[in-house]
Swiss-Prot record:
The glycine cleavage system catalyzes the degradation of glycine. The gene is AMT. It is found in: Mitochondrion. Residues 1-28 form a transit peptide. It is an enzyme of class 2 (transferase). This is Aminomethyltransferase, mitochondrial. Keywords: Aminotransferase, Mitochondrion, Transferase, Transit peptide. Pfam families: GCV_T, GCV_T_C. Belongs to the GcvT family.
Length: 403
């Protein structure tokens, strides 16, 4: 879910999510990178470690990026996402605090229900995307991006201090847990063997605390960043390796890294913060208007509401769209042109789709060019290639609902 751009020569892939150290061995100077509790586990299993958002994480393992991607779509893969910021918001004013920062209707969440939401600024720009869960234990569980760690923490802590100065009992705790994502059509079948809870009763975007393969105190949330069914497991750091090893004993499960995670999320039409959305992009421009709670729209009481609601009611100048493209792989920053050859926009993410066997991308174009089926051009290495505005997700998502 983040950020600078780097080429991985041996993968033939450019990952918008990864910073400039990607694809190079970590030097001694880079040893200051933070390590997840699974660092040694990754090395023992052939993980190729790269720098990402201040952390050392595996970009892939012994399997190729494409093999890992397809295994996730057909079976399930285990991802280490422990670099994500996990926080608890406690106190009677926890909902008030969160709703002062995000666009979603947090008050309407049922116990253990979560939602994707957005931190916004007064100009309507997106400061980060995050998942907020209203737990039955009486706190909000928040997961946000590693690349926005300091910014997000400062934002929430600032609001905590503001409310505390007014006599509120609200407080914030950073959750020092590992976070494992088990993703794919057989993920919950694998997990069910290690839990007493009936996972059929845990639909998409709901959460529960349970014992997982003998590890107590795990929060299991049915969500992910691949478009597949699956879970994210917040597990006490000291037990992370034990849990990962237990999951990996099932032949359905393989380890996967950042490379597969990026192409999976792009096929699913999911945004990468810092590339597809940023502080200068509004939810309407980013095609994320669905994150705006109905009550919040009416009250206009979130940061940037006047700008965002005006765009909802009027006409927005640009929109995020999906593109399917001919020719060479399309990368971020590639110009988008109309059929007359005039530059009208920019690609923000792109890769060859392992499932579709063609190039897919996201980018921003003027609203009049955003209708699916609109023919356009993209420029790759100074050559123009055909592209068509396409509906997202590019690959059908398989979220588990009870409907």
């Amino acid at each position: 879910m983040q950020r600078a751009m780097t080429v991985v020569p041996h993968l033939g892939l450019r990952l918008q999510a990864l910073p400039l150290a990607l694809g190079r061995p970590l030097s001694r100077a880079q040893d200051v990178l933070r390590r997840t509790p699974l660092y040694d586990f990754h090395l023992a299993h052939g993980g190729k470690m790269v720098a990402f958002a201040g952390w050392s994480l595996p970009v892939q393992y012994r399997d190729s990026h494409v093999d890992s991607h397809l295994h996730t779509r057909r079976h399930c893969s285990l991802f280490d996402v422990s670099h994500m910021l996990q926080t608890k918001i406690l106190g009677c004013d926890r909902v008030k605090l969160m709703e002062s920062l995000v666009v979603g209707d947090i008050a309407e969440l049922r116990p253990n229900q979560g939602t994707l939401s957005l931190f916004t600024n007064e100009a309507g720009g997106i400061e980060d995307d995050l998942i907020v869960t209203s737990t039955s234990e009486g706190y909000l569980y928040v997961v946000s991006n590693a690349g926005c760690w300091d910014k997000d923490l400062a934002l929430m802590q600032g609001k905590v201090r503001e409310l505390q100065n007014m006599g509120s009992d609200v407080s914030l705790e950073v959750v020092d847990n590992a976070l494992l994502a088990l993703q794919g059509p057989t993920a919950t079948q694998v997990l069910q063997a290690g839990v007493a809870d009936d996972l059929r009763k845990l639909p998409f975007m709901t959460s529960a605390v349970m014992e997982v393969f003998g590890v107590s105190g795990c929060r299991v949330t049915r969500c992910g960043y691949t478009g597949e069914d699956g879970v994210e497991i917040s597990v006490p750091a000291a037990a992370a390796v034990r849990l990962a090893a237990a999951l990996l004993e099932n032949p359905e499960v393989k380890l996967a890294g950042l490379a597969a995670r990026d192409s999976l999320r792009l096929e699913a039409g999911l945004c990468l913060y810092g590339s597809d959305i940023d502080e200068h992009t509004t939810p309407v421009e980013g095609s994320l208007s669905w994150t705006l709670g109905k009550r919040r729209r009416a009250a206009m009481d979130f940061p940037g509401a006047s700008v965002i609601i005006a765009q909802l009611k009027g006409k927005v100048q640009r929109r995020r769209v999906g593109l399917t493209c001919e020719g060479a792989p399309v990368r971020a920053h590639s110009p988008i042109l109309n059929m007359e050859g005039t530059v009208i926009g920019t690609v923000t993410s792109g890769c060859p789709s392992p499932c579709l066997k063609k190039n897919v991308a996201m980018g921003y174009v003027p609203s009049e060019y955003s209708r699916p089926g609109t023919p356009l051009l993209v420029e790759v290495r100074r050559k123009q290639q055909m592209a068509v505005v396409s509906k997202m997700p590019f690959v059908t998502t398989n979220y588990y609902t009870l409907k």
